[in-house]
Amino acid sequence: PSEQPEKSYSLPVGRIQEMVSSPRHPHLVLTTSRMELHLLNIASGRTIKLDASKVREINDPVFSPDGSWLAYTKHLSLELTAIFLVHLNPDSEGRRLKPGKPVQITDPVRYDFAPYFDPEGRWLYFLSARIFNPIWDTVQTGTTFSRSIKPYLLTLQEVTCNPFLPQPHAPGAAETPPPPVEEKAPTAEPNEAEKGKNESETQSPRIPQLRIDLDGIQERIVEFPVPEGLYEQVIGLPNKVLFTETPLLGAIHGEGGETDENTQGVLWVHDFEKQECEVLAQEVDQVEVNPSGKTMLYFCGNQIRILEAGVTVPDELENDGSPSRKSGWLDLSRVRIAINYQDEWSQMFREAWRLQKEFFWNEQLSGVDWNIIYRRYESLLSRIGSRSELSDLIWEMQGELGTSHAYEYGGDYPFSPQYPVGQLGADLEYEPSRKAWVFRKIYRGDVWRSHQHSPLAEPGHSVQENDHLLEIGGLPLDGSTSPGELLVHQAGQAVQLTVKTPGKKQSNRKIIVKTLLHEGKTRYREWVKQNLKFVEEQSSGRVGYLHIPDMDTEGIAEFHRGFLSQVDREGLIIDVRFNAGGWVSPLVLEKLTHRHLGYDVPRWGSPESYPYHTLRGHLVLITNQFTGSDGDMFTASFKQLKLGKVIGKRTWGGVVGIDGRYHLVDGT
């Protein structure tokens, strides 16, 4: 059964984005969608605004171990983020606070983020994108700075030394000194009754009050002795620090993509006493550590593991994926939940309404009275009987805004069985006169990409258009039995086909093919190739052609594939029909606006344009009514920049942006 909260509080306006509790006092720190940072004193119910941004939301709030300081990330501009500190000045019980002014403690080159205090109060860890080590492109003249992030630390006291430099010390003594302790007035001795109580009930672990020397703190920055990379988290432990690193991989994943490897991160631990860095775990998405720093939890896809923090897992346990106390893996299959769907759907509906109210791009919601809209559609909640009807209700409500990119997708739908059909990358038609299924067209696609060509185009098969398909897996085909029926559950599997070439005696032959899971990319490639062939034939090779399917990863890849190989043509047709949108249109426009300034002329060979890969010919853009979102913006920008003629139909017209970071309670 649902339970009512024991106590409620008056919170700041806007949506609460992050909420972090103090390890020592009854305090909560809240960041809001209105770009403010607040502290809620649970004891008094009072809320104090600590800081606000004029650029973007404040992120990554974290308390010091004694609860007297707060660190967080704040934008200085759209291009710079820095770490800030606020001294909360709490009394001994945390009931009263006198917060100081926010102090910027890092001098960013690009982005400083993810602060975390050393549990012993010596350092503040953080991540920073400030390494400009160019990685040269292998297909064009250009560089990228994909590995720009490193972990760093700030020494919080002037006397604290660089922990990566070995310090002389006596055998058995700690290599790093304890942090300075702010002196406090002596407290009264406990009375006899208190002495008789269990110590765990009357006393919490003694944590010295942290002293931070703010003067010159920006200059007390130390980099970790690790290579730059794609780091995402840094977490302090006693005499150790954890950080996660994500591998640098291509953006296109899955079947037919260039990157099918595991995209999850690596969890590292640096031991200050040993001055060693080693891998704790692989395939890590996110890490959490309890307040004592003794236990860590990490997510691996849909799995959760709990281990002793900072301790290397023995090999026999690392390879043990079965749930147990020893391995640390939780058995989530044991979890059972009871759901009142009417209550859940009601909450989800209101949350969807609230998200639009808070985040729609203009405050007036395009003149729509959003409260009236809520009452109109909320009255239908009691009449819906399925999850899909809830989706329909939310869609209809959002449709009142008359805007683009107002989506709702995913969620807790009942499992529906899947019957994947193996694809042959071909069009087949049954011919009654021949009593056979005939290959009308074979989509060869890119024969050099394993998942993007017809399996019939593999070397040695010699299957041609107009050949007959007689059997699949030894089962005969006829007018009432189609290839699709016999390819159910055969997607991605090796299948035996019996094929015949008409007009040849004893031409029946058996071949083994591995069917495709999806043949969309194979058909798409054939379509692009046919368009290119037509343009080249009609222009005698003087004009090039390329298609951009979206303004995302696939689109930027297709653009460069076509552009770089045809940049020296006298003209170039750019086709954005059916473009599904995205965000990379500025990158494409940047390429198209570059023009020749001169030539590099070698003694032998052909002159090369300067700058490299720049156009010398005319441009034409083809578009249609199915070109949308960033495809809209690209088409309009192409016209505004007068890059060339635009031919086709008016585009979709949906350029209100999207923010897909929010989820409803069932995962929607």
What are these regions (language model features)?
Residues 359, 446-456, 470, 475-667:
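Cleft-lining beta-strand/loop regions that shape enzyme active-site pockets
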Residues 1-16, 23-44, 51-58, 65-84, ...:
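A flexible loop/linker signature enriched in serine peptidases of the S9 family
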Residues 404-451, 536-537:
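PDZ/PDZ-like peptide-tail recognition elements
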Residues 24-26, 66-68, 120-122, 239, ...:
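Short coil/turn segments that connect the beta-strands within blades of beta-propeller domains
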